[in-house]
């Protein structure tokens, strides 16, 4: 793994896992297979090693979830962002496309090799896993009661984005611990789902102190 700005210019993936485990209060041994898959191989990371380790430690339990996505290009863009920030993604089926779709791969490029993806056959299957993790479900919706900038995010939140064509059904609304919206001009429907994901995840990262800074600041 190549790390831009590190003292040596190189940072072995096993060392990265050790740093991450220590940052999370775990043992100093190598990390599990999921993280190894997420960061495996050589990869350019645009941050000093110490800042990336802090970022990864804080974001290790924060997740994005996509509810029955319709458009492969949006999903590919979100997966690329998640790879860059080290955020796992839950994809809740059925999806409107195959995960090997050419359009998805075109949007995600080679970043698919660097993101942890968990696929769930249904919302019920996803909920069983989420509840076992003990993570809050934070729904991003045009029907949200609170602006995302006014919400206090937690490090283990799961940020859920609805289907492009229909959002999420009432069952999913009821399951959410919080329903957030992005303030917009009146008369306009909604933002692109990938843009919305970037805006809200960026705020969540800022709140929990995981925003990377340049060495000069």
Segments predicted by a language model, with ranges:
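Cysteine-centered motifs
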Residues: 15-17, 31
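Intrinsically disordered, low-complexity segments enriched in small polar residues
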Residues: 5-9
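Polybasic, low-complexity intrinsically disordered segments
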Residues: 1-2, 17-24
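Post-transcriptional modification and biogenesis factors for structured RNAs
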Residues: 22, 26-29, 34, 42-217
